[in-house]
């Protein structure tokens, strides 16, 4: 129960060592009071240490024997009968204990001053410290503050302010427009404000394509490759088709001339009326009714 205190360097003591050192000093106070009752005015330090060691060994033996008797009867905590049996086995007269406790010249050892725990400011405290479980002795140091070992997840609250949302949407729209204009400036035709440096302040060319659907009508590269891989017989057929196309073009030219002459005649006949190619936009003409004879 009272293990021997080992000497430790200053500044390297643990809470357990401090606790055992306090118990050792308590035994020294008890030995000093017993020497005072016996009539001694002073004692050497070595003598006090020897008597303290003897008292510590005696009390340790009492505790060890009481513990063994307790475990022998299938119990975990020693009781008063266990201590009485231990004292009897060690040759101590148990009947003299009441008279010794009631002696008149005994010295009363005052309790040590109670040191209050330092008050931690509320600004530095985070939560309440948990008490020790049943299996941890009370003289052990307290648990640290909960914020040192408890994990608290953090998250941002969603922004619900209308003004902030509008500003965020406007900034996103502006960023998208800038990215799109930069992409168009790098991939398409651009115009520059400065003749010397064309890369500074590029402007997207505002000239639309003359025939926007021309790309859709042109053959793709795959079709051109297939045409190149055709046989020589297909080339002959192509020449025939070219000749036919020339004849057709000649016929088309003749037809265009005839249409032009017809249009001129119609324009001469009806100056106010204009020829409209779209049949849905032409003026309505009433059919002529034939009279019955």
From Swiss-Prot:
Compartments (UniProt record) = Nucleus; Cytoplasm
The record's Gene Ontology biological-process terms are: cell differentiation; transcription initiation at RNA polymerase II promoter
Q: Report the superkingdom from the record.
A: Eukaryota
**Chief location:** nucleus
A single Gene Ontology CC term: cytoplasm
Q: Where is the composition biased (Basic residues)?
A: 283-293
Coiled coil (residue ranges)? none
Domain Histone-fold: start-end pairs: 25-92
User: Where can the motif Nuclear localization signal be found?
Assistant: 280-293
* InterPro entries, per database record: BTP, Histone-fold, TAF8, TFIID_su8_C
Give one Pfam hit by family name. TAF8_C
Keywords tagged on the record:
Cytoplasm, Developmental protein, Differentiation, Nucleus, Transcription, Transcription regulation
Q: How does it assemble?
A: Component of the TFIID basal transcription factor complex, composed of TATA-box-binding protein tbp, and a number of TBP-associated factors (TAFs).
Family to which the UniProt record says this protein belongs? Belongs to the TAF8 family.
Record function comment: The TFIID basal transcription factor complex plays a major role in the initiation of RNA polymerase II (Pol II)-dependent transcription. TFIID recognizes and binds promoters with or without a TATA box via its subunit tbp, a TATA-box-binding protein, and promotes assembly of the pre-initiation complex (PIC). The TFIID complex consists of tbp and TBP-associated factors (TAFs). Mediates both basal and activator-dependent transcription.
| Name of the protein described by the UniProt record | Transcription initiation factor TFIID subunit 8
